[in-house]
Each structure stands twice: as structure tokens, then as C-alpha cells.
UniProtKB/Swiss-Prot annotation:
<dbReference type="GO" id="GO:0046872">
    <property type="term" value="F:metal ion binding"/>
</dbReference>
<keyword id="KW-0378">Hydrolase</keyword>
<dbReference type="InterPro" id="IPR015870">
    <property type="entry name" value="UDP-acyl_N-AcGlcN_deAcase_N"/>
</dbReference>
<feature type="binding site">
    <location>
        <position position="243"/>
    </location>
    <ligand>
        <name>Zn(2+)</name>
    </ligand>
</feature>
<feature type="binding site">
    <location>
        <position position="239"/>
    </location>
    <ligand>
        <name>Zn(2+)</name>
    </ligand>
</feature>
<keyword id="KW-0443">Lipid metabolism</keyword>
<keyword id="KW-0444">Lipid biosynthesis</keyword>
<keyword id="KW-0441">Lipid A biosynthesis</keyword>
<dbReference type="InterPro" id="IPR020568">
    <property type="entry name" value="Ribosomal_Su5_D2-typ_SF"/>
</dbReference>
<dbReference type="GO" id="GO:0016020">
    <property type="term" value="C:membrane"/>
</dbReference>
<feature type="active site" description="Proton donor">
    <location>
        <position position="266"/>
    </location>
</feature>
<dbReference type="InterPro" id="IPR011334">
    <property type="entry name" value="UDP-acyl_GlcNac_deAcase_C"/>
</dbReference>
<dbReference type="GO" id="GO:0103117">
    <property type="term" value="F:UDP-3-O-acyl-N-acetylglucosamine deacetylase activity"/>
</dbReference>
<dbReference type="Pfam" id="PF03331">
    <property type="entry name" value="LpxC"/>
</dbReference>
<keyword id="KW-0479">Metal-binding</keyword>
<comment type="function">
    <text>Catalyzes the hydrolysis of UDP-3-O-myristoyl-N-acetylglucosamine to form UDP-3-O-myristoylglucosamine and acetate, the committed step in lipid A biosynthesis.</text>
</comment>
<protein>
    <recommendedName>
        <fullName>UDP-3-O-acyl-N-acetylglucosamine deacetylase</fullName>
        <ecNumber>3.5.1.108</ecNumber>
    </recommendedName>
</protein>
Amino acid sequence: MIKQRTLKQATKVTGIGLHSGKKVTLTLRPAPANTGIVYARTDLEPAVYFPASAESIRDTQLCTCMINDDGVRISTVEHLNAAMASLGLDNLIVEVDAPEIPIMDGSASPFIYLLLDAGIEEQDAPKKFIRIRETVRVEEGDKWAEMKPYSKGLKLDFTIDFSHPMISKDVRNFKMELSAENFIHKISRARTFTFMKDVEYLQSIGLALGGSLDNAIVLDEYRILNEEGLRYKDELVKHKMLDSIGDLFMCGYNILGDFSAYKSGHGLNNKLLRAILANENAWEFVTFEDKEQAPEGYRIGEQVFI
């Protein structure tokens, strides 16, 4: 049986909030089987809890942001979400003492190390997957995102299209099948990116105060401003794929399907997830009693994190 997964022990890290520029402490705690992924604002009294759901995402302008009916928010959840999805985690309490997850280095890599350092253990309950049964597609202008049936895992195909001398056509597309190994080795270190003109505007209105060359790739009109350059030649499209993995995991379950996107972002990713879940014929819950019949990425994942 493919079993649910949680952490062996609690772990914490302190970093900077991308928008506030202030110190943020993130604590990850194990949770019982069938709890799901639950975010919590522990700086509030009483603490405010946000179970992972597509509907909790109510702001996607600059990141993926959970907001409840009282206006309480937790921003920038997508990179941590992507790390949890890649490791097949099912049950976790994510505590944060600020309105945002720390940005760390702008990638998912620090979260991967944090989770692996805590250790991952199986629980005595079957892991539920969402398996796609019908194709669902959403569009906004020339941008689109689509999910088709595919039972062997989560297949990903992402294309970006920026007019910039540093973004040539051969680094605008990336394809990958999600597994812990593929995620860790191929895209986990891909950092968020932005343009200098956007940074200047955001900081002028009190946003992105924690943004710097230490946690983002910054481009001007002609070049990349980071002295160390890129971590991968196609780092930008890989980060957009990383974002989409995190955005799709807001349902709280690993998805079995074939995802493809052109110029998609947080908003369109969330729109796709909502459209899938709203169509009861488009998906179903499945479990796997026989490990040999399970998606390969979840059969061999233990080798990565034990």
C-alpha cells in the first residue's frame, strides 16, 4: 500500500519576508493521518488556521496568497508547497509568525533541506491521489493552462515567452515528470525572478521590501544583475514550473495528470485547479494497495529521503 506521509519531528527556520522585509519564523510540525496540509498564523491570538484548498487562494498578484473571510492572510506559500508536493507529504502543520512564508533564497531548495532534515515517515493510512479523468483547460488572452488524463504521475510541460536578450528560445520550455529525485536535482534550486523596473515600483509602494539579489534573479533591459549568474541556463522557466507545482498542490493532494501551460502564472494556475475540482466528472480520488501499480515517483521516493 502507498501510505500517507508526514514528518518524523518538528523543525523550524527563520528568514526574511519578501514583502515586509522583516524576520519570519517558520515551524513545520508532524500531523496525524488524514489531517492534510494546514497553514497557521501563530502570531495571532487565537491562532488562525488555513486548511489547504484552492478556494483559500484569494490573491495571486505577486504570489500565491491564502486569505480567510476575516482578511487574515498568509502569502508566498508556493515554494514550500512545491517542496511538500515533490516529497509526497500529506499531513503537516505549517506555522508562521507573520503574514508570509520566508522567501529564503527565492527557490524551493531550502525547504527541501528543511523537510529532509526533519525526516519523513509513512503513516498507517492509504495515500489519496487526485486522478484526472477529463481534460480541463483555462485561458486568459494568449495565456493558457491545461490538465489532461495521465495515470503514471504528474507530467509537466511549461513554456514562457519573455522578450529579453537573456531569454533565448532554447530556454523557454521545460518538460519533467514529478518525482522527488527530478524535483530536487532538476528544478528545486530555480529562483524567483523579476525585472528591475518592477522592483523599483513595488518598493515605492511598500512592497517587496525584503527582495534582493540574495533571493531573486533580477534583470534589467539587457542583462542579469546577479553577479553569480544563473543556476541553470533555463532557470526562469524551471522556476515557473516550480511555482505551478506549488499552486496545484493547494488542493492538498498529489495530482495524477498531464499539466501543460503557456505563459501561465499563479492566477491562471489557481483558476485551472478550481475548474478541475468544480467538475466532478473531471477527477476522482484513488489509492494504491499494490505498490507496483502506483505511480513510479511515489514507489521509489523513499530512497531519496530515508
